[in-house]
Amino acid sequence: MAKKCTMHAPLTPAVLHILLALSCGDRHGYGIMKQVQADSQGRAKMGPGTLYGSMGRMIEAGLIRESDKRADPEMDDERRIYYELTGTGRAALEAELKRYRSVVAVAEGRLAHGQ
């Protein structure tokens, strides 16, 4: 059973990118890495060590879990493990995005007024 979420905002960049990647659907590890690269327009690259280390902590915190959903068996390798966002993970992502919006609003206000 997953522990209560101990990952509070601010989230690490790796955790944020993984949550974003899973927010558009279940993915296996390599699929998550490719989605992170696409989402960041190639600016963020995540290797397997960072990915699986972060995901282990995220599973423990209840942010993500293994998914029973599978892609078309004709197009997929049965050895792949798929992951999905939990309700706690979605809430953590929403809280982090709210925090980012607040930071951006302060920055834009200061830049607009030359501060």
Language-model segments: residues:
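Beta-hairpin "wing" of winged helix-turn-helix
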Residues: A61-D76, E84
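Basic amphipathic alpha-helical segments that dock to polyanions
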Residues: L51-M58
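Basic, amphipathic "hinge/linker" alpha-helix immediately C-terminal to the N-terminal HTH DNA-binding motif
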Residues: E74-E96
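N-terminal helix-turn-helix DNA-binding core of bacterial DNA-binding proteins
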Residues: T6-T50
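Amphipathic alpha-helical dimerization/coiled-coil segments
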Residues: T88-Q115
